[in-house]
Amino acid sequence: MTNIEKIKQLAGAVDADLQEDVESVILNAGIYVAAVTTMECASLNLQNRKGEDYRSAVSRTDAARSRAHNAFIDAVNFANKLADSFGVEKIYTGGPERRDYGDFAFAIVKEIYDNRQ
């Protein structure tokens, strides 16, 4: 079963008032991947920032990336608790490392992109 199929299965199993929480996994995956892209772009320093301006840009985008990552991890962990409660397959079975969650976010976004209509 693909990641999206697992998420759809969970969305179909939960009460209507929890479906938004399940959907937030996909939305937060996209937000996190976008935040990583923004931070990496700042690190590339294509605008040739200097000194404090450069450090500030990287720091600001890194903080946004970290917040997005935390939101994604929280959404995934809550969805997995829902999966346990409703007797369906967990959407995430990867490791506890933050990078593992990040890879999962990218896999979700890639799956959405590859199967877009």
Task: Give the location of each predicted region.
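Acidic, low-complexity, intrinsically disordered interaction modules
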Residues: A34-D103, A107
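Short acidic DE-rich linear segments
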Residues: N115-Q117
